[in-house]
Amino acid sequence: MNQRIWINIALLVVIFVLSVIIFFNKHEIEDELLPLSSINPKSIININVQRKNLDNLFFSKSDGVWNMITPLQFQANRARIESILKILETKSYKQFNLDEVDIAQFALRSPAVILELNENKFSFGTNNPINQRRYILFDKKIHMIDDFHFPQLTTKAAYFAETKLLPDTMNIISIRFPEYTIQLNNGKWQASIPEYNEEKVKKIINKWKEIIAISVSKYEKQEGQKTITINSMSGQEINFAIVTTDPYLILGREDLGIQYNMGMDDAKQMFLKTYLKN
């Protein structure tokens, strides 16, 4: 090999070694960063989100279950609540004492969002234009953290709803569809349309027990919409409005103010006779 090739190989080796050193140094530095707080997420039972120009959100935990109390009332999605609580353990990349800075430069004099976890308050300011990390005020210090939480806290209330249509504890005894009914009769599942056997009906029941929506949005009532009514052994009754079937199935809970956007494959397995147009 000529000298130029050897020089190029040496340069590549140097670049590789430097990249490895930078990579591991970065991770060592991040490992040394302190968490934003020492608060145990499991100790939190109330979440209050005050939002400028948006509805405030309030969640409360009872018997291990999170529920939204305002502006809507429904069981909250556990994973999305846990995502909020992760702010307690997020890394603080930089801190400023309040007597060293003007909080106005961080847009913290009138925060866009104030998150209260029990009695602990986190005020959200602007983000850093270079690294896009967010400035927040907590425990009399301004911290710079990864900006994962602000977008979530400024989304619509329905985003936090549980995506599973029925509670795990619901023991179904009947489902009334617009044109037919399936119900438990003397320990056997039957349909009001006789061409369907018990095995087929059981599959429908099991699908409703486990079905999960792709997403949840604010309820939008439509004229002439039909209703699906589900009854349980305990006497509970849940009504789903068929908001639309085109281009995909949307089921509404008018009592909760939300609607479920269903996947096409799942939707086809929820009915004996399909309402889908595709």
Task: Show which residues each predicted segment covers.
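A short-motif feature that recognizes glycine-rich, charge-decorated loops
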Residues: 1-278
